[in-house]
Amino acid sequence: MELTAKPRTPKQKLDESMIAAVAYNKENNVSFALDRKAFDRAFRQQSTTGLFDITVEGGETFPALVKAVQMDKRKRAPIHVDFYMVTYGEPVEVSVPVHTTGRSQGEVQGGLVDIVVHNLQIVAPGPRRIPQELVVDVTKMNIGDHITAGDIKLPEGCTLAADPELTVVSVLPPRLTAEELEAEVQAAQVAGLVAAGELSEEAAEAVLEGDASLEEVKAEASEDNAGTDSEDNSDAQ
């Protein structure tokens, strides 16, 4: 996509309709200004993986990728753009968005697909061969399964720049409801009381099956212990 830019000095103040920008690589550094509306339209279409042919008035034309966009947090509008100059036919490392397709087996079972890494670093064989996105098919994934960076099929000529063991997508178990969470906490408490000898296995089973509350069986256990202590004292006398 083509962008026309105006030359500027690094500290030059700009009109509100313009955005300050810089393009660079290891050898060059060029400061310029872009029409705000034109850049907004172009960036929505291209994002960070799209190639821009930037022509500076009275100067050169060069291909570049968006490296970073500095935003005005209050106005939610870009105030500065960094471009990275690239060369046609030369490999370029880029961050490509990851998206999923399909409905996983884990989702059918109530699980949740979690995209852990939203952008993956790859090396494309040239600026014109950068994929717009990496699509991961999650159809066969079950709860507990995960897909690593090394599992993802890349377009021809592209190679992975990230750790191949990096988890990119996983399927999480269903989230517990408030009642399920309360039941898990209670089960842990009951197990602890049984292990400490403060609750019988019969009483624990009654609580877990809903036949009695934990407070009720604890009260009964206290009464039983009190009765046992009284009998022991009588025998001692």
UniProtKB/Swiss-Prot annotation:
Residues 205-237 are annotated as: Disordered. InterPro entries: Rbsml_bL25/Gln-tRNA_synth_N, Ribosomal_bL25/Gln-tRNA_synth, Ribosomal_bL25_b-dom, Ribosomal_bL25_C, Ribosomal_bL25_long, Ribosomal_L25_dom, Ribosomal_uL5_bac-type. One of its GO terms (molecular function) is structural constituent of ribosome. Keywords: Ribonucleoprotein, Ribosomal protein, RNA-binding, rRNA-binding, tRNA-binding. SUPFAM superfamilies: Ribosomal protein L25-like (SSF50715). GO terms for cellular component: cytosolic large ribosomal subunit. The keyword tRNA-binding applies. Residues 105-189 are annotated as: Middle domain. GO terms for biological process: translation. The keyword tRNA-binding applies. Gene3D superfamilies: Ribosomal protein L25, beta domain, Ribosomal Protein L25, Chain P. Residues 1-104 are annotated as: N-terminal domain. Residues 190-237 are annotated as: C-terminal domain. HAMAP family: Ribosomal_bL25_CTC (MF_01334). This is one of 3 proteins that mediate the attachment of the 5S rRNA onto the large ribosomal subunit. This protein has three domains. The N-terminal one is bound on the solvent face, the middle domain fills the space between the 5S rRNA and the L11 arm contacting the 23S rRNA while the C-terminal domain is on the edge of the intersubunit interface and contacts the A site. The protein conformation changes upon binding of a tRNA mimic to the A site, although the mimic does not interact directly with CTC itself, consistent with CTCs presumed role in moderating A site binding. Part of the 50S ribosomal subunit. Contacts proteins L11 and L16, the A site tRNA, and the 5S and 23S rRNAs. Belongs to the bacterial ribosomal protein bL25 family. CTC subfamily. This is Large ribosomal subunit protein bL25. It comes from Deinococcus radiodurans (strain ATCC 13939 / DSM 20539 / JCM 16871 / CCUG 27074 / LMG 4051 / NBRC 15346 / NCIMB 9279 / VKM B-1422 / R1).
